[in-house]
Amino acid sequence: MTNVNVDVTPLTTKPSQDGFYMPAEWAAQQAVWMIWPYRPDNWRAAGAYAQATFAKVADAIGAATPVYMGVPKAFLAEAKAVMPSHVTLVEMDSNDCWARDTGPTVVVNDNGECRGVDWGFNAWGGHNGGLYFPWDKDEQVAQQMLAQHGFARYSAPLILEGGSIHVDGEGTCMTSAECLLNANRNPELTKEQIEDLLRDYLNVKQFIWLQDGVYMDETDGHIDNMSCFARPGEVILHWTDDETDPQYPRSKAALEVLQNTVDAKGRKLKIHLLPQPGPLYCSEEESKGVTEGTGVPRTAGERLAGSYVNFLITNHRIVFPLLDPATDDIAAQKLQEIFPEHEIVGVPAREILLGGGNIHCITQQIPAGK
């Protein structure tokens, strides 16, 4: 276990000025971060089921990449008992466990140096539809992770969660208007101003804007639940053939955008359709295990935003969520076709989904540089 309490004074320049850019997820990684789940008003049984699932995810990642886990001091003993021994536990306060959204975006330069972008965070909407209050500890997470690695920090003047962007490492950024243009994130900024800031801090040149994310996604449609890059020039899209499903018009509109766009290199996109599980719903028993608090209520019968797109690429391994016995094998086979050189590892992940996200949402990769 390590303890981090280091002030990382932000740089006064921007990554693009300094020759830094966000690499693609398939670039080599030196570590993956996770955070301990404990909120009783979001996780049933005060997180016990989720903690066991997080341990399985950490184990699946750890076979390919070192895993760090931020844990509040009060839960260190519990985490040590539950987590695999190879996981490095780091004492760290947080309001919840979404490392993708509260952690830093690590950028690299051509010499292999790493720095981190620390985005603004308001718990997916602040006082206008946000998912809990307060979020002050979450705002400190990125800085603490960067301090653990000794990386210099850029402080970006933009409310942004890591799950709301995907990049191909070659100048293209994919995102959703439902989230990034939502009035509860950066209402004072225009679309053009948001793009300018992403150019500054990710060093990207071309944007692919999908309108909406997955139906009932409480993050306001994060792109990482809806679509992602598989490699340069190739994307994966969450899909259903059921025209009566509320997801269908969302996926159909996204497909039309992807079919009629090019990336930063001018390439037409090859599109892989990944079938949705379910539909899946929260059960009465699952709902009863969540206590009342400032978190969003978990209501029995509510549709869950399940998606196989919410996987992590980490050092030639794909760690993806097992969500539905009827479609899990189909998803695994499709992922193996898309990633023939990767090992495809499924982890039962319904407990993460019940909390509002999945494997990509609870992880944040640290690129290796060179």
From Swiss-Prot:
Disulfide pairs here are none
MF terms from GO for this chain are: agmatine deiminase activity; protein-arginine deiminase activity
This enzyme catalyses: agmatine + H2O = N-carbamoylputrescine + NH4(+)
Q: Which UniProt keywords apply?
A: Hydrolase
The EC number(s) given in the record are 3.5.3.12
What's the top EC group for this one?
Answer: hydrolase
Q: Which domain of life is it from?
A: Bacteria
Catalytic residues as annotated in Swiss-Prot or TrEMBL: C361
Q: Which GO terms describe its biological process?
A: putrescine biosynthetic process
- Which family, according to UniProt? Belongs to the agmatine deiminase family.
* PANTHER family associated with the record: AGMATINE DEIMINASE-RELATED
Q: What is this protein called?
A: Putative agmatine deiminase
